[in-house]
Amino acid sequence: MPQGIAEVNEINIWWEDFGDSSNPTVLLIMGANANCMQWPIEFINPLVEAGFHVVRFDNRDVGKSTWLYKEGFISKIAKLLPLSISKYLISFAFNVVTDDEGNFTASEQSSKAKYDLSDMAKDAVSLMDHLGIDKAHVVGASMGGMITQVIGLDHPERALSLTPIMSSPGMGDPELSTMTPALIEGMKESFMMNIQGNYEDGVVRIYKELTGSRFPFNEENFREKMKPVMEHGHNPHSGHGDAVGASPNRRSRLKEINLPTLVIHGTEDAILPLDHGQAIADGIQNSQMMIMEGVGHELPEELNGEVISRLVEHFKSA
């Protein structure tokens, strides 16, 4: 498939496209710390067969795009300490950036972020310019769904439709549910694995908590699916978390969006519970919502047919 590097906004963005570029474009934006290989071919090919041109790309700081963040101070220090002290340091760091209820808070680190979601939205729009794409159906997962909202707010003329998947209107909203305690513990353990250089194990540990009950986590299959993702370029130290924390909550602005919008969310999402997706749907006028029962913070391959059918219907009606 055609692929390349777009030099935009003083960084490089790696991209790959599928299908006839004269067809309507679907722009796929992945979530935090995840490169575009997590949009699998099995998800992309049916969209191409339905008559769409599909573009996936690596956000800044992951994959083959420019990495602006490398290993952080806490990680470097933790490597030098005994395991028990490293675990205490990591627990302390998580307590600094979360409140008593498990909400991520705007930390000092976030206030010094090198970029925010508006910069990442500009990357996506600039990539469209580079590829000669005027408008696209914008689909984003998790943080990618947040970038999708920013495009709808700040660059509405570039979007044919919006689809935020397992996403949120923003952090720090006291009316919305928080992460589960089990996920927070899983994140701490994953961070320890990353420090020890066990990056794949770190990803596995997180996804065990993110997977819902409908399709139980299969570690062997997951590791096999993650091989191309890890080989493409996994940056566990990306600044995506800081970018989310440095960005304003969009909930009060969602009413400004006047684009066909489909919100997709699972009922067992441990990091961004269902009410985050519902808040997006409630905030954007005339939006639709697809609720995936028993699904966590994931797009299970078992639901590809159902999800893609709904997406194609959404795109064609836009």
Regions found by a protein language model. Give the residues of each.
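Catalytic active-site module of serine/aspartate enzymes centered on a nucleophile-bearing elbow/loop
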Residues: 287-318
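Short beta-strand/loop motif that positions the catalytic acidic residue
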Residues: 257, 263-265
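Flexible "cap/lid" loop of the alpha/beta hydrolase fold
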Residues: 162-193
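Conserved HGGG/HGGXW glycine-rich cap/lid loop of the alpha/beta-hydrolase fold
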Residues: 11-107
